[in-house]
Amino acid sequence: MNSLLWRKIVGASVIAALILPMSVSAAGIGSRPANPDPNNPRTQSIFIYNLSGGATKSDQLHLQNGLDEKATVEVYAVDGTVTATGDMTCKQKVEDKVDAGKWVNIPKQEITLEAKESKLVDFTVKVPGKVDVGEHNACIVVQRKNTQSLATGGVQIQTRQAVRMAIVVPGDIHRDVTID
């Protein structure tokens, strides 16, 4: 019985050793705002815009391949949402965009980066003319494109990295609550 347990542990360790290097290398793609506001340190890691209804803002995402190999990535926008614990999270690509994620247009959504290469990715935010005041959240997601076929077998790990976008629409917020 102990011999069987030992074989399972060794087998699992060998499988983990084969899989882990792939997952570590997948984390070598990164992004951040390309044009942070020098007066607001938070904009080094988050896009923060104050935009009125109907306004348009063009900006760039700094995309970097930290890997020693060429990588093709997808870049796309999704809605951001606040969790029950107050944390910010990004919706999935397959979910319908109903808020700020819908306002972001990224013309080039598939980008190939050579090893250690960086590129700037252009995008535009267009706030609808009629929109509620307050903060609206989106995420610009970067995800390495899966080039392996499922037919090759093994375990495939897909990771994504995102940069938060907070769009504040100015105005007075009126929240009237009536309790009967």
What do the PLM-derived regions correspond to, one by one?
Residues N2-G11:
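Bacterial N-terminal signal peptides that target proteins for export
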Residues A12-P21:
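Bacterial N-terminal signal peptides
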Residues M22-A26:
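Sec/Tat signal peptide C-region and signal peptidase I cleavage site
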Residues S31-L67, A71, E110-T112, V177-D180:
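Beta-sheet-dominated interaction scaffolds and their linkers
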Residues N35-P36, C90-D99:
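Short, basic/aromatic beta-hairpin or loop at an interaction surface
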Residues S58-Q64, A71-V78, T85-T89, D99-G153:
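Ligand-binding face of N-terminal immunoglobulin V-set domains in extracellular IgSF glycoproteins
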Residues L67-E69, A115-E117, T159, G171-I173:
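Short flexible coil/turn linkers enriched for glycine and charged/polar residues
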Residues V141, Q148-D180:
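Membrane-proximal low-complexity regions enriched in glycine and acidic/polar residues
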